[in-house]
């Protein structure tokens, strides 16, 4: 059996800690939270400082424009700051006939918004617990009635709709509902797919805690080479590209294709002698 490769950087870090002497480990999560609490809102005088780089403010995207123009007809209820995140993560699907699932139909307006945004050929699947939402079915839009907190409902759902491109959870907003939905649908996203969960509110939110734990998997390491530094990705790292956090919103992106290795090669010929890593 091949001996496991040492993580030389971690070995050196542990050695440096030992040299400083034993100290009680601080609660890093609490420290990070406290650091965020210490930020004050900018005063008017601070806002008047000249920025280091001047850029034009971003123009409203198509989704924001659709929302602002929706003065009549089926209702759309969204936080305005969501639209920038939508455009950032979902623009790649425009014109590519994606299969989109939105949990939480409510008054139906967002179904039409997604249909207009993604363009001809997209398939929109709205999920809601209320039978009245069947009224919003139509061309390219299917309505499925069910309880998003029920794993049995999702088991039947993925038998019908196995491969998904986009999931937007705007459903009941309870952590147990959000977790059940994520665990059922995140694995069903195609390569490059995007999972968005809205309305993750409150600093002591259980779905937020769940995502904190989920994100730790991105930092797993199984070293297979020191020169060049190479890590064999875990199953999670192979399939999940990134987890993004915004006020009240979480976006998870699947990798465009399975990742074979995580590698840190050295480029260049001149190196300081104080670090003799790979």
Task: Place the predicted regions along the sequence by residue.
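A short alpha-helical cap/connector motif
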Residues: 2-166, 172-197, 201-278
């Amino acid at each position: 059996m091949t001996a496991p490769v040492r993580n030389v950087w971690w070995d050196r870090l542990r050695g440096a800690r030992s040299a400083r002497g034993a100290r009680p480990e601080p609660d890093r999560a609490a420290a990070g939270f406290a650091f965020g609490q210490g930020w004050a809102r900018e005063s008017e005088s601070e806002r008047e400082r000249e920025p280091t780089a001047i850029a034009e403010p971003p123009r409203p995207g198509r989704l924001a424009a659709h929302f602002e123009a929706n003065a009549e007809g089926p209702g759309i209820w969204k936080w305005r700051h969501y639209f920038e995140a939508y455009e950032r993560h979902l623009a790649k699907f425009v014109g590519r006939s994606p299969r989109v699932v939105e949990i939480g139909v409510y008054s139906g307006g967002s179904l039409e918004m997604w249909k207009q945004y993604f363009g001809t050929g997209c398939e929109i699947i709205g999920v809601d617990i209320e039978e009245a939402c069947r009224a919003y079915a139509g061309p390219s839009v299917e309505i499925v009635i069910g309880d998003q907190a029920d794993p049995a409902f999702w088991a039947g759902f993925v038998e019908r709709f196995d491969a998904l491109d986009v999931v937007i959870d705007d459903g009941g907003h309870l952590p147990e509902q959000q977790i059940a939905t994520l665990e059922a649908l995140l694995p069903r996203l195609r390569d490059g797919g995007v999972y968005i969960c809205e309305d993750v509110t409150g600093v002591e939110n259980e779905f937020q805690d769940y995502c904190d734990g989920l994100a730790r998997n991105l930092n797993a390491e199984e070293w297979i080479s020191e020169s060049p530094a190479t890590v064999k990705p875990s199953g999670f790292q192979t399939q999940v590209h990134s987890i993004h956090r915004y006020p009240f919103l979480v976006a998870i992106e699947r990798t465009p294709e399975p990742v074979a290795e995580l590698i840190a090669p050295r480029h260049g010929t001149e190196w300081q002698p104080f670090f003799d890593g790979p």
